[in-house]
């Protein structure tokens, strides 16, 4: 797979639910449609919460790496 270029990075390491998703929501509000946010997290709940957030808020989860820590998610603002 080609490398995904991110416009922004969010470090959520050490944070626990619901903080990572709250931070993602705040960051995405300040982004333009089509920009990509790289989220780095280690909370196991993010494997469920980030995809659900994207679906509920109409953002695109471009890719995720959740086989080992830290977890990484690439989220594009909008569909």
From Swiss-Prot:
NCBIfam families: PRK00299.1
Principal location listed in the UniProt entry: cytoplasm
Gene Ontology MF: a single term: sulfur carrier activity
Family recorded in the similarity comment: Belongs to the sulfur carrier protein TusA family.
The keyword Cytoplasm belongs to this UniProt entry's keyword annotation: yes
Gene that this polypeptide is encoded by: tusA
Keyword Cytoplasm among record annotations: yes
Keyword vocabulary terms for this entry: Cytoplasm
Pfam families for the chain: TusA
GO biological process: tRNA wobble position uridine thiolation
PROSITE patterns named among the record's database cross-references: UPF0033
PANTHER family hit by this protein: SULFUR CARRIER PROTEIN TUSA, SULFUR CARRIER PROTEIN YEDF-RELATED
UniProt GO cellular component terms: cytoplasm
Active site, renumbered: 17 (cysteine persulfide intermediate)
Localization terms from the record: Cytoplasm
Protein name: Sulfur carrier protein TusA
UniProt function note: Sulfur carrier protein which probably makes part of a sulfur-relay system.
């Amino acid at each position: 797979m080609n490398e995904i270029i991110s416009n922004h990075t969010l470090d959520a390491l050490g944070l626990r639910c619901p903080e990572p998703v709250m931070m993602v929501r705040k960051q995405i509000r300040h982004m333009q449609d089509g920009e990509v946010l790289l989220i780095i997290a280690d909370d196991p709940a993010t494997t469920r919460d980030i995809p659900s957030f994207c679906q509920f808020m109409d953002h695109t989860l471009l890719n995720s790496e959740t086989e080992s820590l830290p977890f990484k998610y690439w989220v594009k603002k909008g569909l």
